[in-house]
């Protein structure tokens, strides 16, 4: 499949995979890509497959000359589902913001190398300052 920008989707998936363990290929559809990060374990006592994590997820949409994004912070539960919930712990919020910024910088550099822009989705209000 070729995206609106003319880039083959399969080639972009490979490049996105090289950014780290963020892309969820099974949740990517058409010109939309899904990334997430399990940044902070809520409780290490349960078995690994039963643990929950604080993290973020990002949806990226390919357009002709740019990719647009939106993201949310929340809880990745033991069933493997994301829920947007308020996070109260300052250390957790700081870690989520840090990992999101790190990923955002890598993603922006990759897309820039392909002559594509990375911009917030038109209806998305950016709660975290991602760039200087």
UniProtKB/Swiss-Prot annotation:
<dbReference type="GO" id="GO:0045893">
    <property type="term" value="P:positive regulation of DNA-templated transcription"/>
</dbReference>
<keyword id="KW-0805">Transcription regulation</keyword>
<keyword id="KW-0175">Coiled coil</keyword>
<keyword id="KW-0010">Activator</keyword>
<dbReference type="InterPro" id="IPR038208">
    <property type="entry name" value="Tscrpt_reg_Crl_sf"/>
</dbReference>
<keyword id="KW-0804">Transcription</keyword>
<dbReference type="GO" id="GO:0005737">
    <property type="term" value="C:cytoplasm"/>
</dbReference>
<keyword id="KW-0963">Cytoplasm</keyword>
<feature type="region of interest" description="Essential for activity">
    <location>
        <begin position="99"/>
        <end position="122"/>
    </location>
</feature>
<comment type="function">
    <text>Binds to the sigma-S subunit of RNA polymerase, activating expression of sigma-S-regulated genes. Stimulates RNA polymerase holoenzyme formation and may bind to several other sigma factors, such as sigma-70 and sigma-32.</text>
</comment>
<dbReference type="InterPro" id="IPR009986">
    <property type="entry name" value="Tscrpt_reg_Crl"/>
</dbReference>
<comment type="similarity">
    <text>Belongs to the Crl family.</text>
</comment>
<feature type="coiled-coil region">
    <location>
        <begin position="90"/>
        <end position="111"/>
    </location>
</feature>
<dbReference type="Pfam" id="PF07417">
    <property type="entry name" value="Crl"/>
</dbReference>
<protein>
    <recommendedName>
        <fullName>Sigma factor-binding protein Crl</fullName>
    </recommendedName>
</protein>
